[in-house]
């Protein structure tokens, strides 16, 4: 996760993170990705059930019951373990997490244990009453998925009227005083909608926007051919960055992030190096602290059946099950080959990634996407859009 707005506009500095000694337990949410101890943010797919049928859903969720999902007692035990382990954030996802009957029991326990609870939702089930419950039952932030305006969004979601319901959910959150943001997964099918979605943020006074690059997981694997090419990705990043700077000049406060393509960090650095050279060294320091892709380190996933994965896009790769061992024990067990390999990935990744001058701020990008595209977990990520000239050492990191 890369904060374009804070890095481009200079609203975060190295000193901000150092004041908290870069400890996950002490850092405020916007500085967590600069932590030194890298306690994992846990994406918890508490159910796989969902009333929509999104074409890019990494969980391949559907509107049916899934046998074997964790019981309330088991889930509360997971939360106790995560709290003891010092996990800073639990991100409730799905499926549609609001379809789990005990969701608010779980979120309340997360809050009572001193952790931050975040909700990832399609927004269609958020009525004014539900929004008030979200606020009262422990959630500090709600991310609502939008893939464009009505026609495009409804096609992506497989349901007519989904856009209207999601917008109603966003408005209900705002009216209830819940911090809410938009999550937009960009592909060739909806890249033309990006300007309109950014205008919508202004119209609806939504303070946060996350642009996700397509991960080839679940149903997303079937539309991998719709992932943006290098020039399309660069245009999207330029458009988004220009909008961030324009909002900043106007005094409009929006937090804008990109997710799941860590080449964005290098592309952002190169722009700052050209346009704000006096800030380049500090931005590079922050990007190195961020460290790029954190699968198996600073992010982990627990699925609806209790399987632990390196991230939410790697459901085919299990590290263990919380019904057999606590998450904390699994996460610290470097005898698990995959876990050790991900944390020592620099020695395993090959191709142009291996010699990239930006490896320490990208960390080889998204391994799940590389494996889906090539069958090799350690191959270069095909979503990297940097040129050979841009990644060449040592010129890449000259300031």
Features from the language model and the residues they span:
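C-terminal accessory region of radical SAM enzymes
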Residues: 231-282, 307-363
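N-terminal pre-core extensions flanking Radical SAM catalytic domains
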Residues: 1-61, 80-83, 327
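Detector for the c-type heme attachment site
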Residues: 57-63, 357-361
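A structural motif corresponding to the C-terminal lobe/cap of the Radical SAM core domain
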Residues: 203, 222-254, 288-291, 376-392
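Short Fe-S-cluster ligation motifs
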Residues: 79-94, 341, 379-399
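Radical SAM/AdoMet-radical enzyme domain recognition
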Residues: 67, 72-93, 99-235
């Amino acid at each position: 996760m890369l904060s374009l707005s804070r890095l481009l506009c200079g609203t975060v500095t190295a000193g901000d993170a150092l004041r908290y000694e870069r400890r996950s337990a002490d850092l405020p949410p916007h500085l967590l990705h600069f932590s030194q101890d890298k306690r994992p943010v846990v994406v918890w797919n508490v159910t796989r059930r969902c009333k929509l049928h999104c074409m890019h859903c990494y969980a391949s969720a559907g509107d049916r019951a899934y046998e074997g999902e964790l019981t309330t007692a088991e889930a509360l035990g997971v939360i106790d373990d995560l709290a003891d382990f010092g996990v800073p954030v639990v991100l409730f996802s799905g499926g549609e997490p609001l379809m789990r009957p005990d969701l608010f029991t779980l979120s309340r326990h997360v809050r009572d244990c001193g952790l931050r609870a975040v909700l990832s939702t399609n927004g269609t089930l958020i009525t004014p009453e539900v929004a008030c419950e979200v606020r009262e039952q422990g959630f500090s932030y709600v991310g609502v998925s939008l893939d464009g305006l009505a026609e495009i969004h409804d096609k992506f979601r497989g349901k007519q009227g989904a856009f209207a319901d999601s917008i109603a959910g966003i408005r209900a959150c705002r009216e209830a005083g819940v911090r809410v943001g938009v999550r937009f997964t960009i592909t060739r099918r909806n890249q033309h909608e990006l300007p309109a979605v950014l205008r919508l943020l202004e119209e609806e006074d939504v303070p946060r926007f996350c642009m996700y690059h397509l991960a080839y997981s679940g149903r997303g694997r079937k539309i991998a051919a719709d992932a943006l090419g290098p020039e399309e990705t660069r245009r999207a990043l330029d458009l988004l960055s220009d909008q961030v700077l324009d909002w900043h000049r106007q005094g409009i406060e929006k937090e804008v992030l990109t997710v799941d393509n860590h080449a964005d960090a290098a592309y952002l650095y190169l722009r700052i190096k050209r346009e704000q050279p006096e800030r380049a060294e500090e931005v590079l320091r922050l990007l190195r602290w961020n460290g790029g892709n954190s699968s198996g380190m600073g992010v982990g996933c627990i699925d609806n059946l209790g399987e632990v994965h390196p991230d939410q896009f790697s459901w085919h790769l299990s590290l263990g099950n919380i019904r057999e061992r606590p998450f904390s024990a699994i996460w610290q067990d470097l005898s698990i080959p995959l876990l050790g390999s991900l944390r020592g990935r620099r020695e395993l990744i090959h191709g142009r990634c291996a010699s990239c001058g930006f490896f320490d701020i990208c960390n080889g990008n998204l391994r799940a996407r590389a494996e889906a595209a090539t069958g090799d977990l350690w191959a270069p990520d095909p979503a990297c859009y940097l040129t050979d000239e841009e990644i060449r050492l040592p010129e890449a990191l000259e300031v």
